[in-house]
Amino acid sequence: MASVQLSSRDISVFSNEYKERRRLQMMRFFGATAFTLISARLAFRGVQSRKYVPNMFQLNHKPPTYSFQGEAVSALAFGTGLATGTFSMLVFGTCWVWDISSLAEFTLKMKKLMGEPVTDQALLENTPMDEDTRKVAEALEDMLKGSRKD
């Protein structure tokens, strides 16, 4: 199982790396926004095209025939486009505001937000052990060293 290593260095606001990272986050959000707006426009046109406006001397209580299957497919497509666009805008906008570029960064920010201290391997190694834990660790090390000699 591979672990993701994140550097704890602060990225300068004026560095090219920071500017490129923020630009990428902005472009993702604007792409999701454009997708949502296009989906909304297509859905609006789809609804408007189904509106029945009778001509002169046509009955206004008999709408034209239509395919239920075609209506269902178009409704599913429009609904999926709108839901996907809105959800992606929410995700990319939140990541842009919180300056998150990867899933590992999101995990660390959520842990910090929920009050869990962010642990580092060096911090764990330098933590003093109590007496019982030290005895168990020494016994395990001795057992492993003994099995390697055989």
Curated annotation (Swiss-Prot):
It comes from the Eukaryota. It is a multi-pass membrane protein. This is Altered inheritance of mitochondria protein 11. It is found in: Membrane. Keywords: Membrane, Transmembrane, Transmembrane helix. The keyword Transmembrane applies. Belongs to the AIM11 family. The keyword Transmembrane applies. The chain crosses the membrane at residues 29-48, 76-98. GO terms for cellular component: membrane; mitochondrion. It comes from Lachancea thermotolerans (strain ATCC 56472 / CBS 6340 / NRRL Y-8284).
